[in-house]
Amino acid sequence: MSETRPSAHPDVEIIEATKGFERFLRMDVFRFRYRRFSGGWSAERTYDVLRRGQAVGVALYDPDRDEIVLIEQLRLPALLAGASPRQLEVAAGLVDVGETPLMVAVRETREETGLAIKGEPIPIQRYLPSCGASDESVDLFCARVDATEAAGLHGVPEEGEDIRVVVKTLAEVEALLDAGAIENGHTLVALYWLLRHRDHLRQLWGPTAAKNGHGADLLSASPIEKPRI
């Protein structure tokens, strides 16, 4: 979780930072001013910030079957936003103290799908899903799995999770995207990235690459080889 007072920046002066409330989520209150584009400093402002912290999402892809493993679970805020409470998503979760994003990608994949990641996940992107109200950052990965092992219900019982595994071909995923049936932000980013890099991933992870030993060469020459996390 983020500290109450953020890192210093020459364009922002934090006058005061106080904790508002904290349950599962935490809200802090900031008094600050900032440098205006026209020059000089703004008037003092007061801002409520949701301190969501760091999260991870991972697109689980089987290159041999050209399938992706998604999860479906109930999201009350989606219902409040006028959307379906049953959301199709990539596996995701928050980073706990002492964890790295990569560790969370492995843990959440196991907890939410029962699958083990094969090899090392590829970093996709770090992005800010709602920086007008929250400090949350999301680190996205793409990881290889065996989709034939994906089935059933999963989740951590102590956390009240009720998660159903859903396997889709990439053609089916593309149709869902075109129909606007996937509404979750980090899932949209991850799936559009996967569609863009699908052919390369099949070369990198597919049976031909493994047989010929070309996986490492493809990774070093890849436009996606440099971690952004």
Task: Give residue ranges: language-model regions.
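A short, amphipathic edge element
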Residues: S2-T18
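Acidic, metal-coordinating catalytic segment for phosphate/diphosphate chemistry
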Residues: G20-R65, L79
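Beta-rich strand-turn-strand
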Residues: G98-M103, E112, A116-K118
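NUDIX/MutT-family hydrolases
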Residues: G155-A181
